[in-house]
């Protein structure tokens, strides 16, 4: 049996973010999705996941999941045999983004989670295409499933994260970097920088996709993953 593959979802997403990948890759290996919840710091979430995962595994994170993945590599580099970073950001959060999150937290505490998620997802997450409305509804369903406290904790974790430049420079394992061509939240430039920092890395741009290529273009995403994992 091949090495286990652990997926880490983006903000307010659950295992459904990786449904096409779970279906494809569970045929040949153990696949699991670790929840990015329970703590209000990236360090805390990463430590908790490391306690519950196999001794060694392939790690794949998208967006917030990619940020957590980088912290897991920092904490336990010997346990990750291959690294996949998708539509993510290695930098500390900008002050203006943190200020926006504070306002979102206030709104969520007032019971306006759906409104906040709708305003955040529509302009930032998805490429224009036939699947957009379906994926929007799925994102809303995932957020509703996770609830207000998860939003608050994840927002605080993202706001307090630190720069992982030095972590990326030290990565020795094979690393795959994926980015949706039209990702406005974590643009291609960020992933080009990650590819430069990680010496043993490969960068692929996914066409017809924005911030969630695992759902927007699963065929292309799975094809690249399958070839790279061989």
What are these regions (language model features)?
Residues 61-65, 69:
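Gly/Ala-rich beta-loop-alpha elbow adjacent to hydrolase catalytic centers
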Residues 209-218, 222:
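Catalytic histidine-centered segment of alpha/beta-hydrolase-like enzymes
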Residues 173, 187-196:
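Short alpha-helix in the alpha/beta-hydrolase fold that links the catalytic acid
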Residues 171, 177-179, 183:
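Short beta-strand/loop motif that positions the catalytic acidic residue
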Residues 192-211:
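Catalytic histidine neighborhood in serine/cysteine hydrolases
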Residues 93-96, 113-169:
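Conserved alpha/beta-hydrolase catalytic His-Asp/Glu region
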Residues 1-43, 62:
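Conserved HGGG/HGGXW glycine-rich cap/lid loop of the alpha/beta-hydrolase fold
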Residues 42, 74-75, 79-119:
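Flexible "cap/lid" loop of the alpha/beta hydrolase fold
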């Amino acid at each position: 049996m091949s090495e286990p593959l652990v997926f880490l979802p983006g903000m307010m997403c659950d295992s459904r973010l990786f449904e096409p990948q779970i279906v494809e890759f569970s045929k040949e290996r153990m696949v699991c999705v670790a929840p990015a919840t329970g703590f209000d710091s990236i360090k805390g979430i990463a430590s908790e996941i490391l306690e519950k995962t196999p001794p060694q595994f392939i790690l794949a994170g998208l967006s917030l999941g990619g940020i957590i993945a980088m912290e897991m590599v920092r904490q336990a580099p010997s346990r990750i045999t291959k690294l996949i970073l998708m539509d993510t950001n290695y930098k500390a959060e900008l002050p203006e983004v943190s200020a926006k999150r504070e306002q979102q937290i206030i709104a969520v505490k007032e019971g306006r989670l759906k409104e906040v998620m709708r305003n955040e997802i529509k302009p930032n997450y998805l490429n224009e295409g036939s699947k957009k409305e379906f994926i929007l509804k799925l994102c809303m369903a995932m957020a509703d499933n996770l609830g207000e406290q998860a939003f608050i904790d994840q927002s605080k974790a993202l706001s307090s994260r630190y720069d992982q430049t030095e972590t990326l420079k030290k990565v020795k394992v094979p690393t795959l970097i994926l980015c949706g061509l039209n990702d406005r939240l974590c643009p291609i430039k960020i992933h080009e920088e990650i590819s430069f920092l990680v010496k043993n890395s490969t960068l692929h741009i996914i066409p017809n996709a924005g911030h969630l290529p695992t759902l927007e273009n699963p065929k292309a995403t799975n094809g690249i993953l399958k070839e790279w994992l061989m």
